[in-house]
């Protein structure tokens, strides 16, 4: 709305690119307000948003007495911590929490793609455009996180999920599973608490292999 944004395939903001078809922030909130008042929805949130967009919506809801965005659904994981730059502070200070999607980097943090493996019917084998998840730097990060998980007697999935769950700006973690065993492993991560040393080691990997 009202500007280019990196969502649904758009991966960068261009100040020189004019938007021909857009709806301004206020009209969007007014339309959503009608749905709330008619009983069709209870609360509103957004997805794939930027600090500018979130701030704008929160400002308008306060100044114009319009419904308030209650959550943001953006990607976040051990190998995608871009939410921490700008968005996390807004989430905490404005109490507009993150609903995490892709906490396992579309399955890459399960280790299923290591050593060149490409399981049949996996996301990477079925859909084009996911190669960025398997680039050399990302693969190196997966190796480091798998090593760290083994050192702490947990799986890489549990390391990845418990890290996401521990972040103060995260309200909910949206998990995906195609097998009961995967579901159990994801759910078990709720009971795992990473100590400060493990978090420091995670940050060390992030500093060496940033995303």
Map each language-model feature to its residues.
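Beta/alpha (TIM)-barrel catalytic core signal, keyed to glycine-rich beta->alpha loops juxtaposed to Asp/Glu
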Residues: 2-204, 209
